[in-house]
């Protein structure tokens, strides 16, 4: 089970730090599915394609982040639920 979260982040001068995050929904990822692909499908339901064209997915292992390409600001994340 993965946790899809909306992220509010602050720039600390060197990088982005999560200020708050809000649970959006639980996401089931089957063992035969790629979590990154499932995350992208969730992003497509959450944002318009025009907005997504300005974003990229960053894979940090247990956390996938949708980040704005120009600034690196995280806007949505999916992490393994504990």
Positions of predicted regions on the chain:
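Short amphipathic, charge-patterned alpha-helical segments
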Residues: 38-43
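N-terminal acidic leader/helix
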Residues: 2-30
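A short, structured loop/turn motif at beta-sheet edges
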Residues: 31-35
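Short, mixed-charge low-complexity intrinsically disordered segments
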Residues: 45, 49-82
């Amino acid at each position: 089970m993965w946790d899809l979260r909306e992220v509010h982040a602050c720039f600390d001068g060197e990088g982005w730090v999560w200020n708050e995050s809000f649970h959006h929904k639980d996401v089931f990822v089957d063992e035969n599915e790629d979590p990154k692909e499932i995350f992208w499908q969730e992003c497509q339901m959450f944002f318009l394609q025009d907005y997504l064209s300005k974003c990229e997915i960053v894979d940090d292992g247990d956390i996938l982040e949708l980040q704005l390409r120009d600034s690196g600001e995280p806007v949505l994340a999916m992490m393994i639920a504990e």
